[in-house]
Amino acid sequence: MSFDISKFPVLAKANTPEDLRKLPQNMLSQVSTELRQFLLQSVGNSSGHFASGLGTVELTVALHYVYNTPFDRLIWDVGHQAYPHKIMTGRRDEMHTIRQKNGLHPFPWREESEYDTFSVGHSGTSVSAALGMAIAADKEAAGRKVVAVIGDGAMTGGMVFEAMNHAGDLHKDMLVVLNDNEMSISENVGALNNHLAQLMSGRLYTTIREGSKKVLQGMPVIKEMAKRTEEHLKGMVVPGTLFEELGFNYIGPIDGHDVDALVETMRNMRSLKGPQILHIMTKKGRGYEPAEKDPIGWHAVPKFDPDQFKKPATKPGLPTFSQVFGKWLCDVAAQDDKLLAITPAMREGSGMVEFSQRFPEQYFDAAIAEQHAVTLAAGFACEGFKSVVAIYSTFLQRGYDQLIHDVALQRLPVLFAIDRGGIVGADGATHQGAFDLSFMRCIPNLVIMAPADENECRQMLYTGYRYQDGPTAVRYPRGFATGAEQIEQMTALPIGKGRVCRQGKKIAILNFGTTLASALEVAEQLDASVADMRFIKPLDVDLLHTLALEHDVIVTIEENAIMGGAGSGVIEALHKLKICKPVLQIGLPDEFIKHGAPDEIIAELRLDSKGILAQIQEYLSE
């Protein structure tokens, strides 16, 4: 559905940045007000990322007003906060389709708009990309400006400081806007974030650099920022920060909700040479009281009525796999104080809220720093502690070298609880868990498990927790569990052993993960045998050998990339056994899977029971 734009009369005049720049500056405050209201109504009617965008309305307006986008390059980090940017860059009438199949992408996406100069989804990439573009702009000598916008949460990632260190050394013209809202998806931790908060709480003192003198000219008095400062700030000050040591000219902090102050500051900063950092203070969820009070809970929302000031109540039902993990974690921690669990800033999403509250001394949020999180777990394991790393499949990619070099190579008993394995849906290509089985299967010493249901998940987690001969990984999907009974008593499974769930004829279906129910449904129609393989590595070669000798065709099913996945492991094992049987691999194709509702994507990829049956029948008829 589209909105009656006449309800937003000033915003209606600014469908693109070019339109916006034609407006007088005194209208920008009204543009911001209407933009926030439009965003509120739009997300309420379609679902999506919410609180972050409410906090960047004035920043978005100021950036597109001052900079000549898309000629000037604007790079958003992660992209949760870029909904206002999408609205202001010609996509206003399509916002109701965001995150839906064939609709607008959930994040800035190069294929979607010339204003989206860099495709994003993972955090910490903006400064590196901006530096690359700044170097290119310098070589082109066309006067192009480059701006990166990054939140305080993403600033906890090491890649950001690698880029800033390089940028300071090269001294290319670029601006980094630090959007400090004291909140990423989960509460930020660490000395850096404490330092950012202290910038506004203590008495700031320093000398003002020549560049800052230019910025101060004509600047209004910055409004008092309640609860966060001891004094009125006039213009900006330059504290001796880490940013200065890295070679950046630091300016700020300033009120990120004062659009006029932002415009004047950015206008002056355009002419400054070298790398600049503008520190702005914003409030996540700005303008909508429930989101201001609970920015984590309102980070992403389903459809809701903004006038009700609450999200729709969730119906009681099956637990999610994340909740299954969280309960298991609490159950084991209650018996073992040597269990230490780590998350890279995904406490809520990984089901660890209760654990963090009940066992705070055993809980560690490593912030958005996946490499550090994995090696931190390795350090725990070296000293005899039971390390558990709760991490999304897509984010484990960022800690791959650490998984190999710091954990598997040393055969350290670290358990990886890998959430969001397979199709995740609305967040799209950057977040699908499509590759983990493929990139883990080649790592020596690593045991890999994929549960078919919540009880297997619980028992596999316990199996990994008890296993001491090396690292283990339990890989489970996003979303609700299957409804299987969870047995409270935990029993370690025999390593590398699967089970036959149905005995049939001619066709043997080897299932890996939560597609088991679909495999059994298909088997009933084909009178096929079905094995719940449980272990991707080590593969149950004895069971495979038996099934291969007793059947004419082997079918493997997994919600992972076919290339290099569990099915590839089956073919490799059959080759080693010198058994030549036709094998149909069913899984994710060799492409990046786009966004949409999980059920829609699964059906399109023919991974539901109907699609699996059709693939097998087509294979048999060839």
Curated annotation (Swiss-Prot):
Binding site for thiamine diphosphate: H80, G121, H122, S123, G153, A154, N181, Y288, E370
Pathways involved: Metabolic intermediate biosynthesis; 1-deoxy-D-xylulose 5-phosphate biosynthesis; 1-deoxy-D-xylulose 5-phosphate from D-glyceraldehyde 3-phosphate and pyruvate: step 1/1
Reaction equations catalysed: D-glyceraldehyde 3-phosphate + pyruvate + H(+) = 1-deoxy-D-xylulose 5-phosphate + CO2
Name of the molecule in the record: 1-deoxy-D-xylulose-5-phosphate synthase
Cofactors that this protein relies on: Mg(2+); thiamine diphosphate
Pfam families linked to this entry: DXP_synthase_N (PF13292), Transket_pyr (PF02779), Transketolase_C (PF02780)
One GO CC term on file: cytosol
Organism annotation: Shewanella denitrificans (strain OS217 / ATCC BAA-1090 / DSM 15013)
GO biological process: 1-deoxy-D-xylulose 5-phosphate biosynthetic process; isopentenyl diphosphate biosynthetic process, methylerythritol 4-phosphate pathway; terpenoid biosynthetic process; thiamine biosynthetic process
Binding-site residues for Mg(2+), renumbered to this chain: D152, N181
EC number(s) on file: 2.2.1.7
UniProt family annotation: Belongs to the transketolase family. DXPS subfamily.
Lineage: Bacteria, Pseudomonadati, Pseudomonadota, Gammaproteobacteria, Alteromonadales
Subunit structure: Homodimer.
One GO MF term attached to the UniProt entry: magnesium ion binding
Keyword annotations: Isoprene biosynthesis, Magnesium, Metal-binding, Thiamine biosynthesis, Thiamine pyrophosphate, Transferase
Cofactor details (free text): Binds 1 Mg(2+) ion per subunit.
Function: Catalyzes the acyloin condensation reaction between C atoms 2 and 3 of pyruvate and glyceraldehyde 3-phosphate to yield 1-deoxy-D-xylulose-5-phosphate (DXP).
Gene assigned in the entry: dxs
SMART domains, per the entry: Transket_pyr
InterPro entries per UniProt: Dxylulose-5-P_synthase, THDP-binding, Transketo_C/PFOR_II, Transketolase-like_Pyr-bd, Transketolase_BS, Transketolase_C, Transketolase_CS
Top-level EC class: transferase
